[in-house]
């Protein structure tokens, strides 16, 4: 299997290109044999060799003289480069120099020999470019005039072409590293390329003599673009510095290429664009070359079997960092607006990588969450006490789980918002599965670890966990209320099971105390209730390590239990009172007990106001003697507690021993009337079984 490291080992002979866009020259290719032969033969010819033969007929001689005069006129233009070679005190800036070529150069005096031009070019004197051009034109004129053999023309043309080879090397050498060139020299190189483009267009206007090889168009502007492409490849392929610890080789490579491209293009915009003629499209040319090489590199990389991290990094660069941090950076955005570089990878490849990323990331999140839950459950079973935070039992499980989820979500959103939306739905599914596993693990702990010393504090720590889960999911995940309830349903069960376990021993202690109501036939209800409240009060400090909201909710559970157990005692049919006075006395006891229960529970945090009417209204039913009044009270009671059934009503009416059976049936039928009230969100009488 191919490895990533193999791909990034670089190519043989590749060297680092330090700095920012210094356009360092790669070793020049050896000249071809034909070029070397042409160069060798140049020493045998002079500019006179390119003129018509002296043995030409008179007419041809006259024509040659006219052309010689014309060539002298061409020298006038070239003098701008030969005069004033000495440096002036105040050398002009490159931006002040004229780089536009003159279409018809004129010369003063005879042309230098080919050997002299060769020597000048070898010394980098670009000003002789115009004289090389003049030789080319003289050759064309000689060929057009006739009188010279084809062999002679071909031989002389080879001399001119050899000079052009030297000139091209010099010009492209300057343009390969434009920031290293003197301003005037760069201006000369640009002017030569522009002039050559003009000559290409001129040559396209008519055919050459049959004996001459077609050497135009030379396409020097296109050659320059090729040089830029080579520079881009050298810069981007350079081996980056040693990868910082924690970064993969691929990550270092991405960072190197991205940073190099951005910095180099900024240099092009700031320093080269003002100097290059518009026809060069210098910003577009460099941008396209860097983009092409960057894209080629990533396309090749995408063919490898990438690890999870490199898949993510590749997408991050293609979809986010490259278009946003490079192409749309403050210095480049406006310049690259019309270039249309496009994406580094084709859409099909991007979709494939995105699918791979989503699969990898969801699998990773699932494994990390499962591991976090496993470690947490091990701490419970090993009887490790939970942490204490602000006086509350604390577990890191919820924080760990939500951080894992959040990191996966953030990574996806860093690629694109669309990928972020895709992974959101997948992560919600995995979170729901994790919460179900959490509930199962917690239930198993409740069942098997009752004898552990830290059993109860670990229960409270897990109940407290629910708060962080609820608030974080509700704030971060914008989902519907129903979806949120379904997602968090396992936590509601976990909390309820935790409450049941924490309160189990208390409720067992209260059971014999509630039995005293019926055992004493409500002879001492005040004292009995005081004993019940004292027992509850002594157990409450333990629950201070719950979060405030859960401590209040726990107290609501206690409140419900007290009211429920009290009603159960009233429904036992053990007490039958035949006089109105006895019934009114019991009603007063019930009211007093109801006030005591309500006051105690409210003082300790219960917000179950829905329970406030449960006992007082039963007391009122017992107190009333008029059948019609009792019916109204029963109907009202049923609207407050829709789960109040005929069985419960029969049990309460059984206390009223002076009520005729016919009236009992009439009162009971009131519950057959549909009041339109829906099932209550909190059950009360459905928790009470009557016989």
UniProtKB/Swiss-Prot annotation:
Residues 33-45 have a biased composition (Low complexity). Residues 9-111 are annotated as: Disordered. GO terms for cellular component: exocyst. Residues 12-31 have a biased composition (Polar residues). It holds the Pfam family Sec6. Residues 91-107 have a biased composition (Basic and acidic residues). Keywords: Angiogenesis, Developmental protein, Differentiation. The keyword Aminoacyl-tRNA synthetase does not apply. It comes from the Eukaryota. One of its GO terms (biological process) is cell differentiation. May play a role as a mediator of inflammation and angiogenesis. Belongs to the SEC6 family. This is Tumor necrosis factor alpha-induced protein 2. It comes from Mus musculus (Mouse). The gene is Tnfaip2.
